[in-house]
Amino acid sequence: MIYLDHSATTKVDPEVLEQMLPFLRDQFGNPSSVYRLAGQSRAAIDRAREQVAALINADPREIIFTGGGSEADNLAIKGYAWAHQDKGKHLITCAIEHHAVLHACERLQKMGFEVTTLGVDQHGMVDPQQVAEAIRDDTL
């Protein structure tokens, strides 16, 4: 089989799988609980968070693990909009964005935000001039 939808999901890298196997087989404790197995899981998550942070020169407190892309899209878009709505309530997106992005923007519209949705050309590209023209003083 030839799989061509790697934007939706991707095969787990063998090195990642090797690191995850102990947690999938034996060390599957709830990292938010209080028992010993849970503590081991929490420690592993904290180590992973520190490794990711070091890789991208971030503070570990800035690293949030999600269950997938749609959850991450919602967290990023809605979280940023809600946290910064005192600075503005205008967002810019693109008509061919992932549905999770578009749905997050639609939800924010229902909550009083304004959303400008830009189209694309025949090659799927957004015109940078359209982006510049869409930016307003209240754009987040």
Identify what each model region corresponds to.
Residues 1-140:
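Pyridoxal 5′-phosphate
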